[in-house]
Amino acid sequence: MTQPVVSDPPVRSRIRPEPKAGILDIVAYKPGKSLAAGFEHPIKLSSNENILGTSSKATEAFLAAADRMHLYPDSRAAKLRAAVAAHFDLEPERLVFGDGTDEVLHLLNQVFLEPGDNIVMGERGFSAYAIGARACQADVRETPEPGHRLSVPAMLGSVDERTRLVFVTQPGNPTGTFLTRAELHALHDGLPPQVVLVLDEAYAEFADDPSFDDGFALARTSQNLVITRTFSKLHGLAALRVGWAYCPQHIADAMDRIRAPFNTSICAQEAAIGALADAEFQARSLEHVRRWRPWLTQQLGGLGLEVVPSQANFVLVAFPEAPGKTAAEAEVWLAQHGLIVRGVANYGLPDCLRITVGLEEHNRALIEALADFMSR
């Protein structure tokens, strides 16, 4: 039987849709690891989650809302809006809610950036800033961070007529460092009025240095300052993705015009309201970090490791470059002992590891494993 002749497909069928210019050049976000070979329940110190878990009030509120999962949520998040406004003494109409802070940051990029514009950020800044900017075909200007700290003169010196956004992580991730009150005001005052200063304050609640400034007082009267916050860290709601921004009214209006209409679920909104109401859980979470962060810093320093002073719920640790003692080898060693930490080579810090402040038994196990590593 004669087989049919198979001809080449027409040219049209070989053409496929391609992403717009620049998309495939973007390096995707790299999350912290969650698995360690040979351990069913490893100690995860790689993602800066709340090590105490979640507020019982948040859990109860989530479960109570579960019978409404067939309904669309309130698009304006009115109850959550009122709760956040009351908790932080803010004007409710100046709040924008998102599917985690990530969405809020992307909204800012979409609102302000055109091809050829640029953003300014520190060289160790959160990679989502650059991802969002490049998706808008904007340029990214990364400024040096001497001593693991943002340089206000360097940031101001990178601003030009095409700069639309300046991103500051306050405190920084993965560094844990921060701009002092004087530095923050100098940066804000030095920016042209058409440039938006964005303070990403995912870790702000953990800061206890008297020179730390959360920026809310400044933002109340500023027309170009946006502050973002999250329920993922202190409040332990990372799985539910609830973030928000406090903006000048005209910026809030622009962001609301393009955000997804139902971007925070009923269960997430109710859990966030419950979390805000649980002052005891918040206090306990802060007390835990503020007790064990200095302990970790001291113990790691005692092993001959350099620890960057941190105002977050993690520490950044620098390892020697000597063979057998590097950060990459330490990360492998810790994983072999059931401890997952975060390598930060993708932030330009190949000699460092970022380590979340864990429970007491986690912290002691970490120090014991690293003591063995450094002495082998």
Predicted regions mapped to residue ranges:
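Active-site pre-lysine segment of PLP-dependent enzymes
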Residues: 134, 150-161, 174-197, 201-234
